[in-house]
C-alpha cells in the first residue's frame, strides 16, 4: 500500500507542475511465494490485485485524481509454484555428527546447474519423495540433498526430513522451482 501511495503522490506532484497526469503506472513485482513449509503462506495473485486496486482507488480519491491504468509484473508468484523439478537419487552417505546424531547425504542427478539459487544466495527449498509411498515404519531421517557437481556448494536442499527408507533410484520432487530454476540454469 505504501508503494502505491508514494507512486500516486509523485504522479500527482508531476501533474501539478507539468499539467499532465500520467495515464499509466507500473507497480512492478516482487510478490513472494512459499518455497518451504516454514515460509509464510503468500497471498494469491488475486489477493495482491485486490489490495493494489483498493490502494489505487483510495489514494486517487484522496488526491482527487483520475485513477491510472495499472500494470504489475507478478512473475515469481505466478511462475514459481507452477513448476516442480524432479531428481533421481544416485547415492546415499550417512555421516555421524556426534552425540548420537547423523545426517544422510542424498546425492541426485542434478544440482547447481539447474537451480543455482541455493548455492548463489542461500535460497531455501524443500524436497519430497515422489516415486513411491514410504514405509511408515522407516520413520524420517534428517537429510541434505546434494547435487552431482564437484563443488562443496552444490547443495539443493540444506535440511529436510525424508523417509528413512529412501533408496538409490527414488525420485525426489523439489517444488516451487518455476520462477528462476530454469531461467538461471546453465
Question: What label would you give each PLM region?
Answer:
Residues 51, 57-61, 65-186:
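Charged (often Lys/Glu-rich) extended helix/loop segments that serve as interaction or gating elements
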Residues 1-93:
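Active-site loop/helix belt of alpha/beta enzymes
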